Amino acid sequence: MLLPWLNEELIEAGCDEAGRGCLAGAVYAAAVILPKDFENELLNDSKQLSEKQRYALREVIERDAVAWAVGIVSPEEIDKINILNASFLAMHRAVDRLKTRPQHLLIDGNRFKKYPDIPHTTVIKGDGKYLSIAAASILAKTYRDDYMNRLHQEFPCYDWEHNKGYPTKKHRAAIAGHGTTPYHRMTFNLLGDGQLELFSK
């Protein structure tokens, strides 16, 4: 079972992002405040769950959470400020949108840009340790998946329905064959070192 809180006396929000390692699409983040007595044995790091489980848990989280919100940073913004800062900004935007103001933030990972007037604790692999971070990981992942599925309808050749923008062979081959889209992150190594050689011959 995951831990329900770090400090029982504080209103804590768990924060996580999705899409940091992708070649295309926005980065999404979520912030979730759960009730202190929240329990769910299935709730875990989104990467450990099936797609069906993630969407079922999203309904539970949205129904039972004290507050939840999603923040988004576009590919254009990612290219301007870099993906690390974009991940922090997405989390800040999610916290901005919470209807209940948290007193403490639990952040998945080992780095974070301080949010104004709210202390935080970074937790490596926090989505496998704290319920609120796991809940945030599920919301960020599922809402970003929905977004990439919509983009797939516009640009089906990149297989975003399956790879969600991550650097698969099929995705990189499509970039080499069809070029980029407005949704690709132009500051990323889109073809990969090995494939750059392959397609330049």
UniProtKB/Swiss-Prot annotation:
<feature type="domain" description="RNase H type-2">
    <location>
        <begin position="10"/>
        <end position="200"/>
    </location>
</feature>
<keyword id="KW-0963">Cytoplasm</keyword>
<dbReference type="InterPro" id="IPR012337">
    <property type="entry name" value="RNaseH-like_sf"/>
</dbReference>
<dbReference type="Pfam" id="PF01351">
    <property type="entry name" value="RNase_HII"/>
</dbReference>
<dbReference type="InterPro" id="IPR036397">
    <property type="entry name" value="RNaseH_sf"/>
</dbReference>
<dbReference type="GO" id="GO:0004523">
    <property type="term" value="F:RNA-DNA hybrid ribonuclease activity"/>
</dbReference>
<dbReference type="GO" id="GO:0043137">
    <property type="term" value="P:DNA replication, removal of RNA primer"/>
</dbReference>
<dbReference type="InterPro" id="IPR022898">
    <property type="entry name" value="RNase_HII"/>
</dbReference>
<keyword id="KW-0255">Endonuclease</keyword>
<feature type="binding site">
    <location>
        <position position="108"/>
    </location>
    <ligand>
        <name>a divalent metal cation</name>
    </ligand>
</feature>
<keyword id="KW-0378">Hydrolase</keyword>
<protein>
    <recommendedName>
        <fullName>Ribonuclease HII</fullName>
        <ecNumber>3.1.26.4</ecNumber>
    </recommendedName>
</protein>
<keyword id="KW-0540">Nuclease</keyword>
<keyword id="KW-0479">Metal-binding</keyword>
<dbReference type="GO" id="GO:0003723">
    <property type="term" value="F:RNA binding"/>
</dbReference>
<feature type="binding site">
    <location>
        <position position="17"/>
    </location>
    <ligand>
        <name>a divalent metal cation</name>
    </ligand>
</feature>
<dbReference type="GO" id="GO:0006298">
    <property type="term" value="P:mismatch repair"/>
</dbReference>
<dbReference type="GO" id="GO:0005737">
    <property type="term" value="C:cytoplasm"/>
</dbReference>
<dbReference type="InterPro" id="IPR001352">
    <property type="entry name" value="RNase_HII/HIII"/>
</dbReference>
<comment type="similarity">
    <text>Belongs to the RNase HII family.</text>
</comment>
<dbReference type="GO" id="GO:0032299">
    <property type="term" value="C:ribonuclease H2 complex"/>
</dbReference>
<dbReference type="InterPro" id="IPR024567">
    <property type="entry name" value="RNase_HII/HIII_dom"/>
</dbReference>
<dbReference type="GO" id="GO:0030145">
    <property type="term" value="F:manganese ion binding"/>
</dbReference>
<feature type="binding site">
    <location>
        <position position="16"/>
    </location>
    <ligand>
        <name>a divalent metal cation</name>
    </ligand>
</feature>
<comment type="function">
    <text>Endonuclease that specifically degrades the RNA of RNA-DNA hybrids.</text>
</comment>
<keyword id="KW-0464">Manganese</keyword>
